[in-house]
Amino acid sequence: MDSRVSGTTSNGETKPVCPGLEKAAEDGALQREQWSNKMEFLLSVAGEIIGLGNVWRFPYLCYKNGGGAFFIPYLIFLFTCGIPVFLLETALGQYTSQGGITAWRKICPIFEGIGYASQMIVTLLNIYYIIVLAWALFYLFSSFTIDLPWGSCRHDWNTERCVEFQRTNGSLNATAENATSPVIEFWERRVLKISEGIQHLGALRWELALCLLLAWVVCYFCIWKGVKSTGKVVYFTATFPYLMLVVLLIRGVTLPGAAQGIQFYLYPNLTRLWDPQVWMDAGTQIFFSFAICLGCLTALGSYNKYHNNCYRDSIALCFLNSGTSFVAGFAIFSILGFMSQEQGVPISEVAESGPGLAFIAYPRAVVMLPFSPLWACCFFFMVVLLGLDSQFVCVESLVTALVDMYPRVFRKKNRREVLILGVSVTSFLVGLVMLTEGGMYVFQLFDYYAASGMCLLFVAIFESFCVAWAYGAGRFYDNIEDMIGYRPWPLIKYCWLFLTPAVCTATFLFSLIKYTPLTYNKKYKYPWWGDALGWLLALSSMVCIPAWSCYKLSTLKGSFRERVRQLLCPAKDLPQGHREGPSAPATPRTSLLILTELEPHH
């Protein structure tokens, strides 16, 4: 018996309808939207998960951690953590038709703090991730010139130590001690105008502030009409980067020295597998790249039709994401191999990760190419699009969570647009501090602590525990079977029960043991209060889970067991099954609720 209200389609087929929809209609609230078609959902998720990390982090991690050998821990984490948690979050959103907070409230109220933790991470992510777009836009606009401004030392921002590195008979034309390249000076002295430390924030970089404003304006209009606008925008933002990546790949592999770069990228060094740091890097890359534990997948899945095959979609999207990362490595390291040969230096000296790759290594390589402004425009336009759809989907996740929490307030005409505007303006104003002369130090704090692998692993531990043990892995498998018509691969259930929490817990503890304070550029050490601020950012999300559980337990009446039992009960308006014909054998319940039922009730 399905507790949802039945609706009838034009062909007479009955489909589940959330009971809140009829109530919302009575309150004058707008009904919850759905994707117009499956492709909009797939492209939206692809746009979210396939971002900057695929281009500037995964290839470097492969090179750093043993080349082809890195795929062993990467694939282990993919199948034990990546795919299971990806499916868990997507199916949870589709089953409950709720955003990243209320979805957890529906299935297990005591773990509603998981939703608050993920949305806290997303809130911080919305503030600092878009800063990369501001930098990329600045570089993009600077590329519309005959001579790229980071290609020479003939500018006002260059110092006497600036040396133009060019190939002369296989060697560098300058070996001056402490020499710097025009690329680095453009990045640090023209773009950032970086100060001596975080305690010296300095003046606002108004050019970057205008780029940030432009990025937020574009982001706002991509999602201001909900999934109706988002679903149309992703047809371009999620597909065009692939065209750019293919163009850069073809150009890269045809350059001299490309084979050497690809060899460094893939050559297996199996001895690196004994280093625990390699396994930690593989695990954190999975969580970063798959956008899990952020509530984004739950929000996007909540707009699916109830009987959408979320299992097949999740598997396909996970392999698409990993495949994109793998191919991006060829595009990046073929260019770095060319750069290594042209400069006559080992590839280890030109290989970079993160902003260093996008704004130092690759621009330096582009200068060496014919028609360099064209390739610079292609690369930075790809960076903008990769970051843009990841950014506006994160904003959509936060907005969806707030709207579903307060539907009577925000699910009315123009209220949602005002909410998005409020989120955008607030995030823009807070983000301005990262565009000051000392803003790069603040950005690094957010990047290192706020959305770190440590925070994501912590949330993943509780997500898998909540679904597998508190709600019941068998019950959730029944829910998925009800939606898609068959049961997923049994191994995924055992991952939720045992492998995922065990692997995530081990990696989380290892990250705590191996913790090292943040440094910038391997030289600048943050003051003690800088590290304290970073830990405050990290704890702001992690503390939500235990704090919310304690709060809910303290507000209810009755014995401790009665309160726990009440908070373990899922919402009564969740669908209980629609299958017709003989029922399948009941799935054994693996739920903490069983323990509370041992106490007699009067």
Swiss-Prot record:
Keyword Disulfide bond included in the entry's annotation: yes
Ranges of the Extracellular topological domain: 142-206
Membrane topology: Multi-pass membrane protein
Topological domain ranges for the Cytoplasmic compartment: 1-40, 549-602
SUPFAM superfamilies: SNF-like
Major location (coarse): membrane
Stretches of the chain forming a coiled coil according to its record: none
Keyword Secreted: no
Post-translational modification Phosphothreonine, affected residues: 587
Location in the cell: Cell membrane; Basolateral cell membrane
GO molecular function, one term: gamma-aminobutyric acid:sodium:chloride symporter activity
Residue positions, PTM Phosphoserine: 591
InterPro entries on file: Na/ntran_symport, Na/ntran_symport_GABA_GAT2, SNS_sf
Pfam families for this protein: SNF
List of glycosylated residues: 169, 173, 269
Keywords: Cell membrane, Disulfide bond, Glycoprotein, Membrane, Neurotransmitter transport, Phosphoprotein, Symport, Transmembrane, Transmembrane helix, Transport
Disulfide bonds: 153-162
GO cellular component, one term: cell projection
Catalysed reactions listed for this entry: 4-aminobutanoate(out) + chloride(out) + 2 Na(+)(out) = 4-aminobutanoate(in) + chloride(in) + 2 Na(+)(in); taurine(out) + chloride(out) + 2 Na(+)(out) = taurine(in) + chloride(in) + 2 Na(+)(in); beta-alanine(out) + chloride(out) + 2 Na(+)(out) = beta-alanine(in) + chloride(in) + 2 Na(+)(in); hypotaurine(out) + chloride(out) + 2 Na(+)(out) = hypotaurine(in) + chloride(in) + 2 Na(+)(in)
One of the GO biological process terms: amino acid transport
Spans through the membrane: 41-61, 68-88, 121-141, 207-227, 233-253, 282-302, 319-339, 366-386, 418-438, 453-473, 490-510, 528-548
Function: Mediates sodium- and chloride-dependent transport of gamma-aminobutyric acid (GABA). Can also mediate transport of beta-alanine, taurine and hypotaurine.
Family assignment from sequence similarity: Belongs to the sodium:neurotransmitter symporter (SNF) (TC 2.A.22) family. SLC6A13 subfamily.
Protein name as it appears in the record: Sodium- and chloride-dependent GABA transporter 2
